[in-house]
From Swiss-Prot:
Annotated binding of ATP, by residue: 652-659
Span of domain ABC transporter: 614-851
Major subcellular location class: membrane
Transmembrane segments: 34-54, 340-360, 393-413, 422-442, 454-474, 484-501, 527-547
Superkingdom assignment: Eukaryota
GO cellular component assignments: membrane
Lineage: Eukaryota, Viridiplantae, Streptophyta, Embryophyta, Tracheophyta
Protein known as: ABC transporter A family member 5
SMART domains hit by this protein: AAA
Length: 936
C-alpha cells in the first residue's frame, strides 16, 4: 500500500546506505584490490631499496677504505685494516675520526683561467699570472682605502716549529678546490692542487715553498705558491653586483667567466661602527635539490675584513688569528640512503592521489548513466546523497591510508617509522577530505567517464612531476620569494607534496645522522603548520563550492546569477489556487478541443482544490541562442489537466517537444514561463516534495548491474517511505505484476536480465509505493507481444488511483492504455481526446485497397468514382491502389456490391475496406500542423 508521507532525511540516508552497502558487497574484490594497492607499491619500494643498497649503499666507494694485512694459506684475506690512510677522498667521509685533525681555514680563490682582472686578461691567463681580485665599496672612501690596504699581509711568516698552523694563520692562504660537506678532511689540502698564498706582491723568496702536514694517520708535504692579490674600489654596491653578474658565463655575450675571490660593502662603517656586507659564490654549495649542502669558504673572508678593521682601529700587528677549523669526533659510518625518503614526496603523492580518479569516475558514472537523477526523481534528496557518498569515500580513503601506514611501517620504511604517526594520520586525513571535496567540485564539469578519467590521471601524475621538478626546485632555491611558495601551495597537489617533502626531510636527516624525526615539538619549526591551515581552509571552501555548483548544475541556473538583476530561484509566476498571471501575448487560434482544455485549466487555476493530479497552465520552454543559432521554442504555451486515475498519452514526431515537457515536469529543467502543479505542488517551488509522490520510467533502463530486481525495488520502496511488512508486500506485488517473481528471477543480478526483463523492472520501479503521478517514456519498448500485454495489464491496474503521462510510438499501446491522447507538433498541442473521439473527428473516411492486373487500373479508378465522386487516390504501385473514401458519401454495403459486380468485368486479386486507424489520425494531424507552420 502507498505511504504518501515523504521520507525523512535519515530514512532517505538509510535507503541509500543499504543500497550502497549491498552494491559494495557485490564489488568486494574491487574494494580489496583498491585497498591493497599500497601494499604492492610499498613492496615495489622495498625492491628498489634492495637494489639501491646493493649498488650504492653497500658499494666499496661508500664506506671507509680497507686493506688486507694478513692472508690465509688459501690466499683469502684473514684480517683487514680500515682507516683514513687506506681511503680515497670519497671514502674518507665514512671513516672513524676519534680525533679529527685541525685544518687550515682557506679562502676560496678562482682558478687562474677564470680570474677577473683589470690587466691584459688574455695574456695573464695564458701564463697563469692573473691576480686574485677583491672588490670593495662603502660610504667612506678614505676608510675603505685603509681597510683595503690592511686586507693582505705584506710579510710572509713561516717556520718549522710545531706551531705551524698558528704560523700559517698569519698568511692569507687559499685554494681553488671547493669545500666538502664536512670539515673532517679538506679537499683543498688532500688534493694534488697547490695552496695559494695571497700577497700584495710576490717576491722570489715567497713564490713557492712547502710545509709538512702531520695529522695521524696522514703525513705528507703540501706545496704553497704565491699569488698576487689585487684590491679594487668601486663606487657603490650596484657596480659590484653588476660586475659579479657579468662575471658568470651567462651574464655576458662572450660567455667568459670573470670571477672575483671576495667582495665587501663597508656601508656606514666608521671608527665607532663596523657594518659590512660580504658577497660570496653560493653556487659552490652544490645542487640546490641535494639534501646535503656543501660548505662555502666564507669564514676566512669574514676574518680578513675583521682583521683589516682591527688594524685600522688598533694599528698594525693587531689580529684575530684564525688558526684552524675542526670537526667533532665521529665513529665509522656507512652510506644509509633510503629510497622512501629520497623519492618519497613524488612517490607517495602518486600513491595518495590514486584515490582521486576512483572517486571522480564514480561520481561522473552516476551522472553519465543518469543514476543520480533517477534516484532524485524517486525522492532521494541532495543532502542524504552527499552525506552517504561522502561517508563512503571517506571510509574507503581512511582504510586505504591506514593500510599504507601499516604496510610501510611493517616492511621497515623509515619514511613512516621515523615520523610521528599522529601527525601523519592527521595530515593524511585532511588531505583525503580535501581530495573528496575537489572530486565533488570538479565532477560537475564532466559528463563522460573517459574524459573525467583522463583529466584525473593527468592531475595525479602531473602533480607529482611538477612537485618534484618545479615546486621542490623553487622551494629549495634561496632566491625564490617565500610568498610565492605560499601561493603555489594553494594548489592541492603542491600542498600535499610539501607535507610529504617535510616528512621525507625529517626521516632522511634522522637516518643520516641520527637526529629525531618529525614530532609535535617540531611542528611549528617545519612548514606543516602552514600546510595544515591551507588544507583546512581549502577543504571547507571546496566543499561549499562543490555543493553550490551541484545545486546550480542540477537546477539549470546560470552559475553567475548573482551578477545579474534577477533572482535565479524565482518561483512560478502563478501559484496554484491563487491569482493567475495573464499572458501579455495573444493566444493564437486553436482547435476547439485544445481551446476547451485551456479554458478548463483556467477554471482549475481559480479553484482552491481539485481532483486533478497534474495541471499545466500556459507552460513554455525556450532554449536560448547558442553558437549563432536562433532561440528554439520547444514548448509553446501548453495547457493541460490530467485527473487522478487517468492515463494521458502523448503522441508526436521527434522534436515535437514531448521530451522537453517531461523534463520540465520531472525537474530536469526549469520552465521559461507558465506554471505546472502536481497535486497542488508547484514544480518550481516544491520539486523536492513532488519527487516523493511521483514515479518515473525513463526511456532507457537505469539500473545497477550487480543489484537484483528485488534489491532495486527495496531501495526505491524505502525512498517512498515504505517500511517493514508494507515494504516486503509492495516489493512482492510489484515483482508479480511484471512477471519477475517466479523461478528466482527476482534474486538474479539485473546485469543478467534480458532487455525485456529490464524494461519490466523499470516499470515496476516507477509504480512501487503507489505514487500519485507516474511518467512513462515508451514503457513497452523491446518487449515481445506476450510480455507487452502482461505489462499493459499491470499499468492499467495501477492507474486506478494514479495519474499517468505516457509517451509512445505504438498506436496499439496508446489505444489500450490511454484514456485520452494528445498529439504534439512543433511544441503545440494540436488535439486532445480519447482514441475513439479522435478517430471519429479526424478519420471521416474509409480506405479501399484493391489489387488487379495493371491493364485494369483505369477500371478500378472508374469503379471508385462511381461509388464516391470525392474519393482520393493515396497509393499506387504495380496494380495495387489505395483510395480514401469519405464516409458521408458511401455506405459499406454499397462498396461490397460494387466490388462484386466489378469482378464480373475484370480480375480482382485482392481487395479490402478499412476504417481509419489511430496511426492515420496521427499522420494526418501531424502533416496538417506542419503544413500550417510552414505557411504561417
Amino acid at each position: 500500500m502507498g505511504n504518501h508521507v515523504p521520507a525523512g532525511f535519515f530514512t532517505q540516508a538509510n535507503s541509500l546506505f543499504r543500497k550502497n552497502l549491498t552494491y559494495q558487497k557485490r564489488n568486494i574484490w574491487s574494494n580489496v584490490r583498491l585497498i591493497v594497492i599500497p601494499f604492492y607499491l610499498c613492496v615495489l619500494l622495498v625492491g628498489i631499496q634492495v637494489l639501491f643498497d646493493t649498488q650504492v649503499n653497500n658499494s666499496a666507494d661508500n664506506r671507509c677504505g680497507c686493506r688486507c694485512i694478513d692472508k690465509n694459506g688459501d690466499g683469502k684475506c684473514g684480517q683487514k685494516s680500515c682507516g683514513l690512510q687506506y681511503s680515497s677522498q670519497n671514502q674518507a667521509f665514512f671513516c672513524a675520526f676519534p680525533n679529527p685533525p685541525p685544518l687550515l681555514p682557506l679562502l676560496h680563490i678562482p682558478r687562474p683561467e677564470t680570474r677577473s682582472s683589470d690587466r691584459d686578461r688574455d695574456s695573464c691567463r695564458q701564463t697563469g699570472s692573473c691576480p686574485v681580485t677583491i672588490l670593495l665599496t662603502g660610504n667612506n672612501h678614505s676608510l675603505g682605502t685603509t681597510i683595503s690596504r690592511n686586507l693582505l699581509s705584506t710579510s710572509f711568516a713561516m717556520n718549522s716549529s710545531d706551531l705551524f698552523l698558528r704560523n700559517l694563520a698569519y698568511n692569507v692562504l687559499g685554494t681553488t678546490s671547493k669545500a666538502d660537506y664536512t670539515n673532517y678532511l679538506d679537499p683543498g689540502i688532500l688534493s694534488d692542487l697547490p695552496i695559494f698564498n695571497v700577497q700584495p706582491r710576490c717576491t722570489p723568496d715567497t713564490t713557492t715553498f712547502s710545509f709538512p702536514f702531520r695529522q695521524s694517520p696522514l703525513e705528507f708535504h703540501k706545496e704553497v705558491r704565491c699569488v698576487e692579490g689585487l684590491n679594487l674600489w668601486r663606487n657603490n654596491s650596484i657596480e659590484i653586483s653588476n660586475e659579479i653578474f657579468k662575471g658568470y658565463r651567462q651574464g655576458n655575450l662572450e660567455e667568459i667567466i670573470n670571477e672575483v675571490a671576495a667582495a665587501y660593502d663597508l656601508m656606514d662603517t666608521d671608527i665607532n661602527n663596523f657594518n659590512v656586507t660580504i658577497w660570496y659564490n653560493s653556487t659552490y654549495k652544490g645542487d640546490l635539490r641535494d639534501r646535503r649542502v656543501k660548505y662555502v669558504r666564507v669564514p676566512r673572508s669574514v676574518n680578513l675584513v675583521s682583521n683589516a678593521y682591527l688594524e685600522f682601529l688598533q694599528g698594525s700587528g693587531t689580529k684575530m688569528l684564525f688558526d684552524f677549523v675542526k670537526e667533532m669526533p665521529k665513529q665509522e659510518t656507512r652510506l644509509r640512503l633510503e629510497m622512501a625518503s629520497l623519492i618519497g614526496p613524488i612517490f607517495f603523492t602518486w600513491v595518495i592521489l590514486l584515490l582521486f580518479p576512483v572517486m571522480l569516475t564514480s561520481l561522473v558514472y552516476e551522472k553519465q548513466q543518469h543514476l543520480r537523477i533517477i534516484m532524485k526523481m524517486h525522492g532521494l534528496g541532495d543532502g542524504p546523497y552527499w552525506m552517504i557518498t561522502y561517508a563512503y569515500f571517506l571510509a574507503i580513503s581512511i582504510v586505504y591510508i591506514i593500510c599504507l601506514m601499516i604496510f610501510g611501517s611493517a616492511i621497515g620504511l623509515k619514511f613512516f617509522r621515523f615520523n610521528d604517526y599522529s601527525i601523519q594520520f592527521i595530515f593524511y586525513f585532511l588531505c583525503i577530505n580535501l581530495q573528496i571535496s575537489i572530486a565533488f567540485l570538479v565532477s560537475s564539469a564532466f559528463s563522460k567517464i573517459e574524459t573525467a578519467s583522463v583529466a584525473a590521471y593527468l592531475y595525479v601524475f602531473g602533480s607529482g612531476l611538477l612537485g618534484a621538478f618545479l615546486f621542490q626546485f623553487l622551494l629549495e632555491g634561496l632566491s625564490f620569494p617565500r610568498s610565492w611558495i605560499y601561493i603555489m601551495e594553494l594548489y592541492p597537489g603542491f600542498s600535499l607534496y610539501r607535507g610529504l617533502y617535510e616528512f621525507s626531510q625529517y626521516a632522511f636527516k634522522r637516518n643520516l645522522n641520527g637526529s629525531g624525526g618529525m614530532k609535535w615539538k617540531d611542528f611549528n619549526d617545519s612548514a606543516m603548520e602552514e600546510i595544515f591551515y591551507i588544507i583546512i581552509v581549502e577543504w571547507f571552501v571546496a566543499l561549499i563550492a562543490a555543493y553550490y555548483t551541484d545545486k546550480i548544475s542540477s537546477s539549470g541556473i546560470d552559475p553567475f546569477f548573482f551578477l545579474k538583476n534577477q533572482n535565479p530561484f524565482k518561483k512560478s509566476p502563478s501559484p496554484y489556487g491563487l491569482q493567475r498571471q495573464v499572458s501579455a501575448i495573444a493566444i493564437e487560434m486553436e482547435k476547439l478541443d485544445v481551446a476547451h482544455e485551456r479554458v478548463k485549466v483556467e477554471q482549475l487555476m481559480l479553484e482552491t482544490s481539485t481532483g486533478h493530479a497534474i495541471v499545466c497552465d500556459n507552460l513554455k520552454k525556450v532554449y536560448p541562442c547558442r553558437d549563432g543559432n536562433p532561440q528554439k521554442m520547444a514548448v509553446r504555451g501548453l495547457s493541460l489537466a490530467v485527473p487522478s486515475g487517468e492515463c494521458f498519452g502523448m503522441l508526436g514526431p521527434n522534436g515535437a517537444g514531448k521530451t522537453s515537457f517531461i523534463n520540465m515536469m520531472t525537474g530536469l529543467m526549469k520552465p521559461t514561463s507558465g506554471a505546472a502543479f502536481v497535486h497542488g505542488l508547484d514544480i518550481c517551488k516544491d520539486m523536492d516534495i513532488v519527487y516523493t509522490s511521483i514515479g518515473v520510467c525513463p526511456q532507457h533502463d537505469l539500473l545497477w548491474e550487480t543489484l537484483t530486481g528485488r534489491e532495486h525495488l527495496l531501495f526505491y520502496g524505502r525512498l517512498k517511505n515504505l517500511k517493514g511488512s508494507d515494504l516486503d508486500q509492495a516489493v512482492e506485488e510489484s515483482l508479480k505484476s511484471v512477471n519477475l517473481f517466479r523461478g528466482g528471477v527476482a534474486d538474479k543480478p539485473a546485469g543478467k536480465y534480458s532487455g525485456g526483463m529490464k524494461r519490466r523492472l523499470s516499470v515496476a520501479i516507477s509504480l512501487i509505493g503507489s505514487p500519485k503521478v507516474v511518467y512513462m517514456d515508451e514503457p513497452s519498448t523491446g518487449l515481445d507481444p506476450a510480455s507487452r500485454r502482461s505489462l499493459w495489464t499491470a499499468i492499467k491496474r495501477a492507474k486506478n488511483h494514479t495519474a499517468i503521462i505516457l509517451t509512445t510510438h505504438s498506436m496499439e499501446e496508446a489505444e489500450f492504455l490511454c484514456d485520452r491522447l494528445g498529439i504534439f507538433v512543433d511544441g503545440r498541442l494540436q488535439c486532445v481526446g480519447n482514441p475513439k473521439e479522435l478517430k471519429a473527428r479526424y478519420g471521416g473516411s474509409y480506405v479501399l485497397t484493391m489489387t488487379t492486373p495493371s491493364e485494369h487500373e483505369k477500371d478500378v479508378e472508374m469503379l471508385v468514382q462511381d461509388v464516391s465522386p470525392n474519393a482520393k487516390k493515396i497509393y499506387h504501385i504495380a496494380g495495387t491502389q489505395k483510395f480514401e473514401i469519405p464516409k458521408e458519401e458511401v455506405r459499406i454495403s454499397e462498396v461490397f456490391q460494387a466490388v462484386e459486380k466489378a469482378k464480373d468485368n475484370f480480375r480482382v486479386f485482392a481487395w479490402g475496406l478499412a476504417d481509419t486507424t489511430l496511426e492515420d489520425v496521427f499522420i494526418k494531424v501531424a502533416r496538417t500542423a506542419q503544413a500550417s507552420n510552414v505557411f504561417s
